[in-house]
Design a protein with these regions (language model features):
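N-terminal cofactor/phosphate-binding cores enriched in small/glycine residues
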Residues: 42, 54-55
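Anion-binding (especially nucleotide phosphate/pyrophosphate-binding) glycine-rich loop
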Residues: 2-29, 57-162
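Short Gly/aromatic-enriched secondary-structure transition segments
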Residues: 47-54
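Structural beta-strand/beta-sheet cores of well-ordered domains, especially the beta-sheet scaffolds
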Residues: 34, 59, 69, 116-118, ...
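Short amphipathic
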Residues: 28-32, 83, 211-215
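ATP-dependent small-molecule kinase catalytic core of the GHMP/sugar-kinase superfamily
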Residues: 46, 152-215
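Short, solvent-exposed loop/turn segments at secondary-structure junctions
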Residues: 46-47, 129
Length: 215
């Protein structure tokens, strides 16, 4: 989500400090938001129109390159660390939170990108299982971080499609494109009118007095 939020900026700074203590390196930090959907529930996977909006809850990823072909991934939310070899991807996910990370890395690799070894520290405040797209937020933040640290060009629509593919084919969740698309394209103070068939989209200003209430 584009725009500035002092609280989110402070959380990102704290994550960077934790990363430096854990990995003894200065990271780059990326974040991607969760979402609410205002119009068009259950129409994204039927190629219909939807109108989601990004929210302030987000997933943050601190990342720095390694000198080998490993991804070392630590989750602050789960207080757990996992390691993966970029040259030996598993066939499918195992039902673990890290499936979303390795699934994105694998999908990027099989789409012509070349992820490099990296250390990642992940935390987020998108409520899990609440319909706010915590998984898409994680996928997009990780995908953007992996592409950036590898020095690769980033096309936001392609990133959204690859993250959707990772969730469909590696994680095994049959989602449409809406969640990953708004997480990668969301703008502060705007909803997004999206045609899920053509992927044409238009940001719609919400207005200064508009409030989105999540309950």
């Amino acid at each position: 989500m584009r725009g500035s939020n002092p609280e989110i900026d402070n959380q990102a700074e704290c994550l960077g400090q934790k990363f430096a203590q854990l990995f003894d390196a200065a990271p780059r930090i990326f974040q991607a938001p969760g979402r609410v959907n205002l119009i068009g529930e259950h129409t994204d996977y039927n190629d219909g129109f939807v109108m989601p909006a990004a929210i302030d809850f987000c997933t943050r990823v601190a990342i720095a390159p390694r000198h080998d072909r490993k991804l070392v991934v630590r989750s602050e939310n789960f207080a757990e660390q996992r390691e993966f070899n970029l040259d030996a991807f598993p066939d499918k996910g195992s039902g673990h939170w890290s499936d979303y990370v390795i699934g994105v890395a694998k999908t990027l690799s099989f789409s012509g990108s070349t992820p490099i070894g990296a250390n990642l520290l992940i935390e987020g405040d998108v409520p899990q299982g609440a319909g706010l797209s915590s998984s898409a937020s994680l996928e997009v933040a990780v995908g953007y971080a992996l592409l950036d640290v590898a020095g690769e060009a980033i096309d936001l629509t392609k990133l959204a499609l690859l993250c959707q593919k990772a969730e469909n084919e590696f994680v095994g969740a049959r989602c449409g494109i809406m969640d990953q698309f708004i997480s990668s394209h969301g703008q502060n103070g705007h909803a997004l009118l999206l045609d899920c068939r053509s992927l044409e989209y238009r940001p719609l200003p919400l207005g200064d007095e508009a409030r989105l209430v999540i309950c």
